[in-house]
C-alpha cells in the first residue's frame, strides 16, 4: 500500500467539534491554506490537520483547560458520591446493631480464684471459626447455692486489668473493655465460686441486644452515667427468655451474688452513647473527617483485635475432667431467638437505592440542607476561588491592554517615548545598548520598535497613519438626530441590467455614456420618489475586476438591491455581491430583471439564490423579491416601495446639526484639467458647507464648491446626500474618510503628519522590495517582469486595473507596476517609461502633444484602451509570450540495420532499411537494441548508393553512420525525432 493510502484522514466537522469552533471557520481556513475541500464533511490529511491545530492553538489550549477542569470536577464529585454511599451504609449498619449500652464487664478477685464476666463478642467483625464452648455442670434446681457444682474454665493467663480502689472517676482515659471489681474481705466463702467461671451470654444479653465492643473514651464529660452503679448487681436476676436444661444451674449461681457484696469494689468508669457522639462529631467535622471518624469508630483497633483474639483463645481451652457429666454447650446455643430477631431487624432497614441516589444528587448539587457544614464550606470556598480566578483574569486582561502600545510602523524615539510614558533619553540609551545609533527624530523600523517595547515591558501593535491620527468624534445629541434618506447600492453581474434600472429610475441615459455599455465607475445619484421621499443610489461595476469598488459600495450602504437577469443564471459576481452584503450586515432586496423576455425563468433564479443562501419571502425566507423589467418599467414602483419599507424598518437617522463637524466617505475621485481634483463624497454625519477645511487620507483642502451629480452647484450637503467636492490639494484615494476640521492649520498639520509617515513607509518598502527581489533572483533564477505605467481618468479605475493586472502572474512572469496616476500622459511618464523599459497604458486618457512626440522619439509602446477587458487580455498575451515555451518530442521515422560494413578511417557503417517515416540528415537519433536505448546523438553520414542525401523515405535502403559511436550491430533500430516548442498558457 502506498504511503498516501496509509495516511490518516480527519473530517473537518470532527476537528471543529474537538476545537469547539465553527466548522465554517475551519473550512475557510483550510481553503485559504490551499486545501481542496468542498464542505465540512470533507476529509483532510495529517499536514492540514497540523496546520489547523497550529492556527487554532488558543482554542485548543482553552479546550484542554476545560477538559482538565471537568475531569477534576468529576473526580471530586465521584469522591463525594463514594463518601456519601459509605456514610449511608455505616448509618444503616449502626441502626441495625446500635442499642442502649450493655453493663460494663465485672471481674471479681480473691486470693486464688477470680470471676470474669466477659463482654459479648458475637458481633466482632472477625467471628471465630468455631462457636465458643463452655462446659457447665448440671445440678438440680433444689440444691442449695452454698455448695454448687464447679463450673470451671481453665485460664492459663487471665486477662485482668490492674486492681484499683473505689474512687471518684478521674479525668484520665481508661480502656472500658474490662472493668475491675475488688472483692471485699467479708464476703463468705459460700458466696464465692470455687473456681473462675464465665457467665453465659444468654444471661448477660437477655435484656439488651448485642453491641460491638465500644472504643476508648476520649472525652471525660461522657462519664456522667456513674449513678447507674447500684443497678449492676441486679444483672443475675434477669429473667431468661427461653431457658434450656443446663441453664437453671447457671442461673442459681448468678443469684448467689448479692448487691451489698458487690458494692464494695465496683468501679464504673463510664458509658458510651454512640448516638450522641456521632451527632457531636457531625457538628464539628466536615464531610471527609466525618467519614474517616465513622470508619475508625466501627472498625476495631489493632489493640482491641488482639485482646479479643486472646479472649477467644481462652474460651477454647478444654474443661477440667472433674465434672465428667457436663455437656459442652456453645455460647450462642441460646441465641436462636435472638438470631431470629436479628434476621427480622436486618430486613427492616434494608438499603434503598432510591435513597442513596437522592443523597448523591443532593451532595452533588450542594442543596442538601442536612449535609455537613464542611461540604457547604467547601462548596462556598470553591465558588469563591472561581470568582477570584475570574477577577484575576479580568485584571490580567486589563493590565495587558494597558501594556499594549498602538504605534505606526516608522515612529521616532520621541513619539514612542510619549506613548510608553518614558523619556526619549531612555529609548536612545536602550538603542545604544542594543547596538543601534539613533537620534531623537530618526525613524525606527518595525523590528526595532518591537524590540524596544519588549525591553520596557510593552507589546507593540502597529496601526496605519490614518488610525494613528484619527480625529476624536463626539457623541451625537438626540435632539440633532433626524430621519435620513436610505443609501441603496445596486449590485449584480455584468450586463444584468443594473445601470438600466437606475436609468429608468433617474430618467436618464447613464449607459449611453459608458464605454462598451458596461459601468466602469462607481456612481452616486440622489432620486426623489413618491413625492418628496429621497433615495441615494450607488451604481457599482459588475465586472470581476471591480471587486474593490463593490466592497466599498457595500460598506457605506444601508440596503442592497441585487439585480439578477431572469433569462440568465446566478453568476460568480452575483455570489460575490451577496457575500459583500452579508459581510457588511445590510439587508438584500432581490430584483429579477428582464422578466419581459420569453426565455425568462424566475423560479430557476430563486432556486439558485436559495442554494447561495438567499431565500426569498415567497419560499419562507426573509429576503424580499420583485420581478421587474428595467426597459419597460414593469415592477419598478413595487421595488421602490419595498426599498422604502426596508428603510423604515431600519429606522435610519442622521445628525443634521450645523455645529457638528461634517464627515463622509470618498466614493470616487478624478482629475479634471480645468477644475483640478474632483471627488464624489457621500456625507454621513453633519452638514458639509462651502468653505469648510477638511482632511481626507493623506491630503487636505478647503471646500471651494459643491455640485450634485448633474453638475449643479449647491450651498451645502446633508447626511446621505452624494456631492462632488472641489478643493483638494492632492488626489485622495477611494474609500478615505473625509473629516471637517476647525481651522486650516489643524487640517494641514494632520495631513503633513500622515504624509511623513507614508513617505517613510514607501521609501523603506521600496528599498526592501528591491533587496528582496535581488536575493530571490539570485536564488531562484531571473524572474521575467513586464513593467507598466498606468494612467487613467479616475482613481477607482486605477485600482481596478492594478488589481486585475496583479492577478495575471505565475512563478516565471508577473506584472510590475512602475507608476500609476490620474490624468493625461505627460512627458514625465514617457521619460520614466524609457528609463525603466516599461509600457504605458492609457485608460480613457490621451497624451499631450509633447509627450506623444517624445514617445515616438524614444520608440516606446503606448497603448490606449476604453474597456478594461481589452487591457487584461493584451497584458495576459504579452506575459504568455514571455514564458519559456514547452518542449515536445515529435517522431520522424525509424530504420533497421541489416548489415555492417567496415570502412577504413571511418569505422562501422550500417546498411539499413527504412521502416517508416523519413530520415533527415540533420535529425536527432537514438539507437535501440532489444528495445533498450544505447545511444542518443546525431547522424555522421546518410548515403544512398554512395551519394550523400538529405533525406530517405520509407521503403528505401540507405547507409548511415553515427557521430562518435561505432558499436552498431545487425538488428538495431535507429529512431529519428525532433524537438518542437509549444506556446505556454498562464
UniProtKB/Swiss-Prot annotation:
Residues 629-631 are annotated as: G5. It is found in: Cytoplasm. GTP binds at residues 492-499, 539-543, 593-596. GO terms for molecular function: GTP binding; GTPase activity; translation initiation factor activity. Residues 517-521 are annotated as: G2. Keywords: Cytoplasm, GTP-binding, Initiation factor, Nucleotide-binding, Protein biosynthesis. It holds the Pfam family GTP_EFTU. GO terms for cellular component: cytoplasm. Residues 483-653 form the tr-type G domain. Residues 75-105, 127-148, 185-258, 277-394 are annotated as: Disordered. Coiled coil: none annotated. Residues 539-542 are annotated as: G3. Its main location: cytoplasm. Residues 593-596 are annotated as: G4. It comes from the Bacteria. Residues 185-210, 218-235, 315-338 have a biased composition (Low complexity). Transmembrane segments: none annotated. Residues 75-94, 292-313 have a biased composition (Basic and acidic residues). Residues 492-499 are annotated as: G1. Residues 339-348 have a biased composition (Basic residues). InterPro entries: EF-G-like_DII, IF2_II, IF2_N, P-loop_NTPase, Small_GTP-bd, T_Tr_GTP-bd_dom, TF_IF2_bacterial-like, TIF_IF2. One of the essential components for the initiation of protein synthesis. Protects formylmethionyl-tRNA from spontaneous hydrolysis and promotes its binding to the 30S ribosomal subunits. Also involved in the hydrolysis of GTP during the formation of the 70S ribosomal complex. NCBIfam families: IF-2, small_GTP. HAMAP family: IF_2_B (MF_00100_B). Belongs to the TRAFAC class translation factor GTPase superfamily. Classic translation factor GTPase family. IF-2 subfamily. This is Translation initiation factor IF-2. It comes from Pelodictyon phaeoclathratiforme (strain DSM 5477 / BU-1). The lineage of its organism: Bacteria, Pseudomonadati, Chlorobiota, Chlorobiia, Chlorobiales. The gene is infB.
Amino acid at each position: 500500500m502506498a504511503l498516501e493510502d496509509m495516511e490518516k484522514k480527519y473530517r473537518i466537522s470532527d476537528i471543529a467539534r474537538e476545537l469547539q469552533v465553527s466548522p465554517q471557520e475551519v473550512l475557510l481556513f483550510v481553503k485559504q491554506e490551499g486545501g481542496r475541500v468542498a464542505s465540512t464533511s470533507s476529509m483532510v490529511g495529517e499536514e492540514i490537520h497540523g496546520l489547523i491545530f497550529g492556527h487554532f492553538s488558543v482554542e485548543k489550549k482553552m479546550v484542554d483547560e476545560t477538559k482538565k477542569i471537568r475531569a477534576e470536577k468529576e473526580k471530586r464529585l465521584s469522591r463525594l458520591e463514594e463518601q456519601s454511599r459509605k456514610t449511608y451504609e455505616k448509618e444503616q449498619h449502626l441502626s441495625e446493631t446500635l442499642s442502649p449500652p450493655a453493663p460494663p464487664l465485672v471481674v471479681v478477685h480473691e486470693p486464688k480464684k477470680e470471676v470474669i464476666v466477659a463482654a459479648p463478642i458475637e458481633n466482632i467483625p472477625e467471628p471465630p471459626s468455631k462457636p465458643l464452648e463452655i462446659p457447665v455442670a448440671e445440678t438440680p434446681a433444689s440444691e442449695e447455692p452454698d455448695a454448687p457444682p464447679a463450673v470451671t474454665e481453665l485460664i492459663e493467663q487471665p486477662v485482668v486489668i490492674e486492681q484499683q480502689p473505689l474512687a471518684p472517676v478521674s479525668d484520665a482515659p481508661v480502656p472500658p473493655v474490662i472493668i475491675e471489681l475488688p472483692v471485699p474481705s467479708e464476703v463468705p466463702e459460700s458466696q464465692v465460686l470455687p473456681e473462675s467461671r464465665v457467665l453465659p451470654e444468654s444471661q448477660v444479653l437477655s435484656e439488651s441486644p448485642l453491641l460491638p465492643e465500644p472504643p476508648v473514651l476520649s472525652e471525660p464529660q461522657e462519664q456522667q452515667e456513674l449513678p447507674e452503679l447500684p443497678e449492676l448487681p441486679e444483672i443475675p436476676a434477669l429473667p431468661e427468655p427461653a431457658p434450656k436444661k443446663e441453664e437453671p444451674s447457671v442461673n442459681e449461681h448468678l443469684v448467689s451474688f448479692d448487691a451489698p457484696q458487690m458494692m464494695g469494689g465496683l468501679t464504673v468508669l463510664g458509658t458510651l452513647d454512640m448516638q450522641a457522639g456521632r451527632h457531636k462529631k457531625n457538628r464539628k467535622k466536615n464531610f471527609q473527617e466525618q467519614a474517616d471518624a465513622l470508619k475508625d469508630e466501627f472498625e476495631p483497633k489493632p489493640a482491641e483485635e488482639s485482646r479479643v483474639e486472646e479472649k477467644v483463645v481462652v474460651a477454647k481451652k478444654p474443661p477440667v475432667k472433674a465434672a465428667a457429666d457436663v455437656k459442652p454447650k456453645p455460647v450462642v446455643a441460646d441465641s436462636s431467638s435472638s438470631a431470629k430477631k436479628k434476621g427480622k431487624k436486618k430486613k427492616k432497614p434494608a438499603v434503598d437505592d432510591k435513597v442513596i441516589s437522592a443523597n448523591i444528587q443532593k451532595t452533588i448539587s450542594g442543596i442538601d440542607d442536612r449535609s455537613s457544614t464542611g461540604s457547604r464550606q467547601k462548596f462556598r470556598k470553591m465558588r469563591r476561588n472561581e470568582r477570584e480566578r475570574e477577577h484575576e483574569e479580568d485584571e490580567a486582561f486589563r493590565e495587558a491592554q494597558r501594556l499594549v502600545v498602538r504605534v505606526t510602523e516608522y515612529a521616532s524615539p520621541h513619539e514612542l517615548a510619549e506613548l510608553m510614558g518614558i523619556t526619549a533619553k531612555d529609548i536612545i540609551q536602550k538603542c545604544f545598548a542594543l547596538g543601534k545609533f539613533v537620534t531623537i527624530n530618526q525613524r525606527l523600523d518595525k523590528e526595532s520598535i518591537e524590540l524596544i517595547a519588549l525591553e520596557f515591558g510593552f507589546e507593540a501593535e502597529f496601526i496605519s497613519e490614518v488610525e494613528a491620527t484619527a480625529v476624536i468624534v463626539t457623541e451625537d445629541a438626540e435632539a440633532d438626530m433626524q430621519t435620513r434618506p436610505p443609501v441603496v447600492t445596486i449590485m449584480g453581474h455584468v450586463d444584468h441590467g443594473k445601470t438600466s434600472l437606475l436609468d429608468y429610475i433617474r430618467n436618464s441615459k447613464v449607459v449611453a455614456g459608458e464605454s462598451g455599455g458596461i459601468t466602469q465607475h462607481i456612481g452616486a445619484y440622489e432620486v426623489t420618489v413618491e413625492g418628496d421621499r429621497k433615495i441615494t443610489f450607488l451604481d457599482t461595476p459588475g465586472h470581476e475586476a471591480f471587486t474593490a469598488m463593490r466592497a466599498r459600495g457595500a460598506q457605506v450602504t444601508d440596503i442592497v438591491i441585487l439585480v439578477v437577469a431572469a433569462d440568465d443564471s446566478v453568476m460568480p459576481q452575483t455570489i460575490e455581491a451577496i457575500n459583500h452584503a452579508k459581510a457588511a450586515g445590510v439587508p438584500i432586496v432581490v430584483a429579477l430583471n428582464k422578466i419581459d423576455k420569453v426565455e425568462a425563468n424566475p423560479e430557476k433564479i430563486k432556486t439558485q439564490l436559495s442554494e447561495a443562501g438567499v431565500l426569498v419571502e415567497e419560499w419562507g425566507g426573509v429576503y424580499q423579491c420583485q420581478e421587474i423589467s428595467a426597459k419597460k418599467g414593469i415592477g419598478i414602483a413595487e421595488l421602490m416601495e419595498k426599498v422604502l419599507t426596508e428603510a423604515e424598518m431600519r429606522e435610519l437617522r442622521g445628525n443634521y446639526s450645523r455645529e457638528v463637524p461634517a464627515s463622509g466617505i470618498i466614493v470616487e475621485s478624478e482629475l479634471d484639467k480645468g477644475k483640478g481634483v474632483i471627488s464624489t463624497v457621500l456625507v454621513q454625519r453633519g452638514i458639509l458647507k462651502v468653505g469648510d477645511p477638511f482632511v481626507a487620507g493623506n491630503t487636505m483642502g478647503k471646500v471651494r464648491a459643491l455640485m450634485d451629480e448633474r453638475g449643479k452647484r449647491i450651498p451645502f450637503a446633508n447626511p446621505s446626500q452624494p456631492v462632488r467636492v472641489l478643493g483638494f490639494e492632492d488626489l485622495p484615494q477611494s474609500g478615505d474618510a473625509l473629516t471637517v476640521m476647525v481651522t486650516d492649520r489643524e487640517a494641514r498639520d494632520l495631513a503633513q503628519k500622515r504624509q511623513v509617515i507614508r513617505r517613510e513607509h514607501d521609501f523603506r518598502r521600496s528599498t526592501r522590495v528591491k533587496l528582496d527581489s535581488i536575493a530571490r533572483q539570485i536564488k531562484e533564477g531571473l524572474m521575467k517582469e513586464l513593467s507598466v505605467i498606468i494612467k487613467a481618468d479616475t482613481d477607482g479605475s486605477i485600482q481596478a486595473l492594478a488589481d486585475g493586472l496583479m492577478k495575471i502572474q505565475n512563478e516565471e512572469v508577473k506584472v510590475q507596476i512602475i507608476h500609476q496616476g490620474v490624468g493625461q500622459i505627460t512627458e514625465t511618464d514617457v521619460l520614466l517609461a524609457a528609463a525603466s523599459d516599461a509600457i504605458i497604458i492609457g485608460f480613457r486618457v490621451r497624451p499631450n502633444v509633447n509627450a506623444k512626440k517624445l514617445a515616438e522619439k524614444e520608440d516606446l509602446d503606448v497603448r490606449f484602451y476604453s474597456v478594461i477587458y481589452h487591457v487584461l487580455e493584451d497584458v495576459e498575451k504579452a506575459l504568455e509570450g514571455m514564458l519559456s515555451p514547452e518542449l515536445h518530442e515529435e517522431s520522424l521515422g525509424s530504420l533497421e540495420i541489416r548489415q555492417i560494413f567496415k570502412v577504413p578511417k571511418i569505422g562501422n557503417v550500417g546498411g539499413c532499411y527504412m521502416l517508416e517515416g523519413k530520415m533527415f540528415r540533420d535529425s536527432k537519433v537514438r539507437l535501440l537494441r532489444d528495445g533498450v536505448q544505447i545511444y542518443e546523438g546525431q547522424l555522421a553520414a546518410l548515403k544512398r548508393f554512395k551519394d550523400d542525401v538529405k533525406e530517405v523515405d520509407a521503403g528505401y535502403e540507405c547507409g548511415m553512420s553515427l557521430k562518435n559511436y561505432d558499436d552498431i550491430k545487425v538488428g538495431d533500430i535507429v529512431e529519428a525525432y525532433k524537438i518542437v516548442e509549444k506556446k505556454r498558457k498562464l
